[in-house]
């Protein structure tokens, strides 16, 4: 790679936070409430735990191979060809993830804000922004995330804080509604699918200053982003109640709409919220796009990724335009999200187990001759 | 036939033989021994000049010699009194002694001439060049060597308050064009042997002296070497100003953002040198160039540091706000009016609609037209002579604002918005950075006109990403915000009290990190007045006595 | 690759820029929008129904019967007639435009409206929607769908029920404000700030309507003497149909049971032993609701604590000079409030309208009972008339004003 290893622990944490907080923040309460009604916060919490587990596995795996990304060390662990095949799966998955995120973004913008603008234009502009920014090296990548995180976190927290004035704690009870356990489990999977962006930690660890602190960075990353998601779910459920949320596509947006800055200076805060949300989506898209390109570069051992970033864009755009309408799109997102959990959690767990077995066997072999 | 076929004209233009070309061709040849030949060669190259002054005389009444110089550059008094006079009259201690030819030069230089800068040289090109710089050359018949003495005197303006950077609290000295005065201004502020000044000459025709100043032990060696390397790679006719150098050594010349900072103030230069930067000075330019820079320098002034920390922080916050305003305010206005009027309170929205009712074109066009006229007005006021300028600018603004509104060419709110934006852009102290933001306002306005608030966000993200990827001599442009640096952060938005910033910011990777001394600063302890202070004295006195004082040091 | 990579880049970027030339799709100048500030919905009368043109359907083949056609009156702000600065005296022109259309549903009516208005209709500043009582009694659910799907509509808009026809409200001309509908909207918005009504905006209406254990309520307005609007009570709903209204003082009592902190209503309390009364005004309230099951049947206990002040006494023969008499007034006021509350609850029980939200308390605190016996909103509305309740009111008179006697 040749780039100096300069990513600090704080930068790694902020990369995780801004990657995770993205398009999913808008429909999140809807998914949670569909699964668990008033126990939506509980469902969210379990989803966060599952995602945290996956992330810790990845971080631990990365710490055992601090110089390599998952593309290269998977080849070490399970053999060259098998590793390559799985890596191609991973790359395809992230390509699809990028396109779905871009499409969801376009759908929100075209429905809520710019109603006459064609969907293609909004999607292309965002993809163009991401692909142009991807031409830089990984240090600039982390600078960008580091810079935008406070701008993303602060307005969301402020909106949530102001909105609690209208909260009705009755809507949050009972906390654990044991009606539909299967539905709740499905909801848990959907929620943890929102955290899949954290897979990029495999790309970050080789460029970190102190890779052994990756676990600490992932812990804080999940804590902050998961905490924010939980807060949003609690706030929306408390203010709207689970029944009302089932009727709204983007409850978080409605939350911002209902909130007014005291003194009624600005009335429709959702426009400002959307502006900040554009930032969050950009960082998420940027991450997954960069991961795709970086991994492609490693898989095929290319020299640099600048041309690649332009090259991939038409594919992503094409995939983003595939879903027919917004309902179709959400079905695909749920399906692919859950399938993706196999790739982001099962596959690393599988790698870790095999890695353990190999090193245990190696230790045994070393111990023998003595 | 010849109409349709283009003949390639390969006629070579004859090359004019300019004196400099002649000098370049030959390399450094030694001068001949004969005086006549020497004078003839000089007249060949410089003879057409009115100010070439050749005075033939006899040294000690014996040896024929000639003094050659360009009279416009020299101090005639020095030439006459300190050089010609002692040479023509035999000095007391040499009367009656033997003055052989081969020892003559040594005798003259060490015992006769009343000048500290007398030196010996023999190459013809070198001597011509020295003459062009204001030195007087003494040719002696029969000796190869010649003596050259620095008699330079050029009219320069006096040190005055810098015009582009005015402050209320702080020193009022500014650099002038002469590089030796500028270096003097720096040196008296840094009486330490670590302050190093290296010079080089750049520019084929101007051969300008370029000085690289830094503090050894604080500035990072790699940066200094990089600066030298980039400067040595410049190959151009003329360096008339520091700006020329800037364009050659910048990391990314296509970026709208400046990656160096130029300043007219010596105190600002010294402050930056102490932080670990390198200053570049050019003879003939009253600006010094500072590298490497980060973005948050562009809204800081020396006044921030000379004032108390609350005052400095408050003013800095106002400046940051003005900076943000000058970038996005018109675009926000356009997106609110054309795309999302539901953000405005209802009564206001309806009233604004009333204000815009007569205007025949969309808000974007209106804003663009007024912005462009503001830019033209601004440029015009800079070029106007002072007497006409003041009145005309007031009239211009009033006319544009009031009359345009009444003619129905714009709505009153647009004028207010643009006026605030323009005023905001003046608040940014660094001219080059303010200009960058002024320029970037236009693309964002166009994006806002197409996409509304979403367009503004996309434009802002684009600009930020670009800034985050810039580097100035290896230092990331957005440090200390982006690669975060807790010491540097104390100076970004607010200006922390000086005693809270004990280390230099890390992004410059200085070799020596400590600003304040290791003992606790006793600043806040001065708050104890009266009884407490006496008590302190009884317990052994204050421990910090870092600044020695003595009676006879007024320098 | 191509010989000149830079040319390729330039060509691609030009290609990308071309779609931008086609224009700014969403840009619409603020003075070119027809800002609809208020809407009024009435039932369409016979002749009005005939006026409908074939704008959203051909012929008479849609399943919605003609008798349910609505008449929508919109108040649109006219740009240019409303000045930015202080108002010039002598503005004789009305700054708003009132347009009337009929339609089968709300969106249908909006489409018809657009046919009649030059600029594109913009609902982003819609502050208040007035429903006539007729329409409210018929059912409000048909409007909710349109209002929810449209992203321009704010959730903080106000929804009110009016005694007279809603069109009358749109044509009002109150002298206090330049734009009539803004006066109306401000008045409704300030109702909760002053303490005259619990917080109510359309978003809350929807939330309560969706929730399983509560029925919604809306302010009930009436016009007195041509231009004055009065808050005449609270309209309570069963599901989405209005079933009754309270009188104004009962709003205060309702707020007490709901636990709205800010007080605003005063009542005449008879001083025991005498024939005189004093006016006691509530300043703040604190409520605690407990739900239990008694013999398997739901029971609600409400405990309310009032903090009041005496604003006026009717005649000089009463002396408010010692705390004993204040105590007496307190007990008397508690008694009468308790009676009023019980009356109100019974009234709503008769109409099967649980505006107090007791059902929500049951659902939240006794989930087993809820899941076994109730589960749906309809079932709760059946059970509601049967529940038992007890009310305890505790008033404290903290202040008597500046007069010492």
Region annotations inferred by a language model:
Chain B
Residues 1-328, 343-346, 466-555:
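Membrane-embedded alpha-helical signal segments
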Residues 332-335, 345-351, 355-530, 536:
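Generic detector of multi-pass transmembrane helix bundles and their immediately adjacent loops
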């Amino acid at each position: 790679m040749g780039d100096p290893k300069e990513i600090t622990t704080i930068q790694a944490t902020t990369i995780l936070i801004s990657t995770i907080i993205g398009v999913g923040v808008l429909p999140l309460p809807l998914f949670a409430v569909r699964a668990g009604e008033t126990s939506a916060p509980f469902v969210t919490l379990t989803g966060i735990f599952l995602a945290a587990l996956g992330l810790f596995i990845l971080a631990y795996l990365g710490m055992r191979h601090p110089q390599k990304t998952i593309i290269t060390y998977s080849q070490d662990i399970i053999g060259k060809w098998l590793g390559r095949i799985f890596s191609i799966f991973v790359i395809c998955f992230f390509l699809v993830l990028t396109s779905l995120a871009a499409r969801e973004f376009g759908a929100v913008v075209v429905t809520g804000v710019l109603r006459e603008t064609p969907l293609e234009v909004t999607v292309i502009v965002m993809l163009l922004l991401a692909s142009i920014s991807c031409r830089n090296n990984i240090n600039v990548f982390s600078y960008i995330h580091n810079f935008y995180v406070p701008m993303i976190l602060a307005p969301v927290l402020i909106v949530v804080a102001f909105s609690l004035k209208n909260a009705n704690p009755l809507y949050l009870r009972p906390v654990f509604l044991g009606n539909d356990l299967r539905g709740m489990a499905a909801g848990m999977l959907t929620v943890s699918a929102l955290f899949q962006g954290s897979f990029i930690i495999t790309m970050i660890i080789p460029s970190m200053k102190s890779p052994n602190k990756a676990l600490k960075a992932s812990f804080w990353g999940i804590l902050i982003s998961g905490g924010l998601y939980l807060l949003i779910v609690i706030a929306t459920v408390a203010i709207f109640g689970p029944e009302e949320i089932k009727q709204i596509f983007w409850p978080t947006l409605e939350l911002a709409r209902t909130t007014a800055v005291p003194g009624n200076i600005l009335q429709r805060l959702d426009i400002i919220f959307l502006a900040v949300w554009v930032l969050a989506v950009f960082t998420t898209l940027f991450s997954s796009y960069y991961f795709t390109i970086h991994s492609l570069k490693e898989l095929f051992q290319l020299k640099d990724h600048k041309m690649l970033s332009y090259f991939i864009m038409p594919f992503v755009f094409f995939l983003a335009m595939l879903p027919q309408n917004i309902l179709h799109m959400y079905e695909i997102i749920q399906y692919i999200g859950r399938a993706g959990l196999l790739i982001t959690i099962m596959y690393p767990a599988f790698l870790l187990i095999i890695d353990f077995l190999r090193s245990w066997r190696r230790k045994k072999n070393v111990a023998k001759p003595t | 036939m010849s109409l349709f076929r283009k003949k390639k004209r390969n006629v070579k233009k004859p090359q004019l033989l300019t004196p400099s070309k002649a000098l370049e061709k030959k390399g450094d040849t030694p001068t001949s021994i004969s005086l006549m030949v020497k004078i003839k060669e000089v007249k060949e190259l410089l003879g057409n000049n009115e100010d070439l002054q050749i005075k033939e005389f006899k040294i000690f009444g014996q040896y024929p010699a000639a003094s050659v110089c360009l009279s416009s550059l020299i101090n005639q008094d020095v030439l006459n009194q300190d050089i010609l006079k002692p040479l023509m009259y035999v000095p007391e201690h040499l009367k009656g002694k033997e003055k052989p030819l081969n020892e003559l030069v040594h005798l003259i230089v060490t015992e006769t001439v009343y000048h500290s800068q007398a030196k010996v040289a023999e190459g013809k090109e070198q001597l011509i060049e020295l003459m062009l710089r204001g030195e007087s050359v003494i040719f002696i018949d029969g000796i190869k060597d010649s003596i050259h003495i620095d008699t330079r005197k050029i009219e320069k303006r006096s040190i005055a308050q810098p015009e582009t950077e005015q402050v209320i609290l702080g020193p009022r000295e500014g650099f002038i064009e002469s590089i030796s005065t500028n270096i003097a201004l720096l040196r008296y502020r840094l009486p330490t042997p670590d302050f190093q000044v290296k010079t080089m000459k750049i520019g084929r025709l101007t051969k300008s002296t370029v000085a690289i100043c830094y503090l050894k032990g604080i500035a990072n060696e790699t940066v200094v070497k990089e600066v030298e390397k980039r400067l040595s790679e410049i190959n151009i006719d003329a360096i008339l100003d520091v700006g020329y150098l800037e364009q050659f050594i910048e990391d990314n010349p296509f970026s709208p953002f400046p990656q160096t900072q130029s300043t007219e103030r010596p105190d600002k230069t010294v402050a930056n040198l102490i932080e670990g930067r390198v200053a570049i000075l050019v003879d003939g330019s009253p600006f010094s160039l500072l590298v490497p820079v980060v973005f948050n320098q562009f809204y800081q002034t020396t006044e921030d540091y000379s004032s108390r920390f609350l005052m400095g922080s408050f003013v800095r916050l106002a400046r940051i706000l003005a900076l943000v305003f000058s970038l996005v305010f018109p675009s926000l206005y356009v997106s609110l009016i054309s795309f999302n009027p539901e953000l405005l309170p209802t009564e206001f929205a309806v009233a604004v609609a009333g204000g815009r009712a007569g205007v025949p074109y969309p808000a974007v066009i209106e804003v663009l037209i007024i912005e462009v006229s503001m830019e033209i007005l601004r440029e015009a006021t800079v070029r106007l002579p002072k007497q006409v300028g003041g009145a005309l600018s007031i009239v211009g603004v009033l006319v544009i604002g009031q009359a345009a509104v009444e003619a129905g060419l714009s709505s009153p709110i647009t004028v207010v918005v643009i006026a605030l934006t323009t005023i905001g852009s003046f608040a940014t102290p660094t001219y080059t950075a303010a200009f960058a933001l002024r320029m970037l306002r236009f693309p964002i306005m166009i994006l806002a006109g197409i996409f509304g608030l979403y367009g503004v966000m996309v434009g802002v993200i684009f600009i930020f990403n670009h800034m985050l990827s810039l580097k100035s001599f290896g230092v990331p442009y957005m440090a200390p915000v982006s690669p975060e640096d807790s010491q540097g952060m104390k100076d970004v938005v607010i200006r922390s009290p000086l005693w809270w910033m004990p280390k230099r910011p890390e992004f410059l990777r200085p070799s020596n990190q400590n600003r304040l001394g290791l003992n606790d600063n006793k600043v806040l302890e001065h708050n104890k007045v009266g009884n407490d202070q006496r008590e302190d004295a009884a317990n052994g006195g204050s421990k910090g006595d870092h600044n020695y004082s003595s009676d006879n040091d007024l320098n | 690759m191509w010989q000149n990579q830079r040319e390729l880049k330039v060509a691609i970027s030009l290609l990308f820029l071309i779609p931008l030339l086609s224009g700014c799709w969403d840009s619409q100048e603020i003075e070119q929008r027809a800002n609809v500030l208020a809407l009024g919905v009435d039932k369409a009368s016979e002749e009005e129904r005939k006026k409908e043109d074939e704008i959203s359907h051909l012929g008479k083949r849609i399943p919605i019967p003609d008798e349910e056609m609505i008449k929508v009156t919109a108040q649109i702000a006219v740009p240019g007639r409303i000045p930015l600065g202080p108002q010039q005296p002598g503005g004789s022109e009305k700054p708003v435009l009132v347009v009337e259309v009929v339609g089968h549903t709300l969106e249908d009516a909006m489409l018809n409206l657009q046919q009649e208005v030059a600029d594109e209709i913009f609902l982003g500043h819609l502050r208040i929607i007035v429903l006539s009582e007729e329409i409210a009694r018929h059912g409000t659910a048909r409007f909710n769908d349109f209002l929810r799907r449209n992203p321009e509509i704010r959730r903080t808009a106000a929804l009110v029920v009016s005694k007279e026809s809603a069109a009358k409200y749109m044509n009002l001309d109150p002298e206090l404000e330049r734009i009539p509908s803004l006066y109306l909207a401000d008045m409704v918005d300030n109702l909760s700030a002053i303490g005259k009504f619990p917080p109510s905006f359309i978003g809350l209406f929807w939330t309560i309507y969706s929730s399983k254990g509560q029925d919604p309520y809306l302010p009930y307005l009436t016009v007195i003497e041509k231009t004055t609007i009065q808050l005449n009570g609270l309209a309570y709903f069963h599901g989405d149909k209005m079933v009754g209204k309270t009188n104004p003082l009962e709003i205060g009592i309702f707020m007490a049971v709901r636990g709205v902190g800010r007080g605003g209503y005063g009542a005449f309390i008879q001083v025991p032993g005498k024939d005189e009364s004093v006016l006691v005004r509530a300043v703040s309230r604190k409520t605690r609701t407990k739900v239990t099951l008694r013999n398997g049947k739901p029971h609600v206990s409400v405990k309310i604590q009032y903090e009041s002040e005496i604003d006026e006494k009717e005649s000089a023969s009463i002396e408010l000079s010692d705390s004993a008499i204040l105590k007496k007034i307190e007990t008397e006021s508690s008694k009468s409030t308790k009676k009023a509350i019980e009356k109100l609850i019974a009234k709503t029980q008769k109409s099967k309208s649980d505006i107090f939200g007791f059902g929500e308390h049951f659902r939240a605190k006794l989930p087993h009972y809820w899941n076994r016996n109730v589960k749906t909103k309809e079932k709760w509305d059946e059970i509601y008339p049967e529940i038992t309740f007890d009310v305890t009111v505790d008033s404290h008179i903290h202040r008597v004003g500046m007069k010492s006697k």
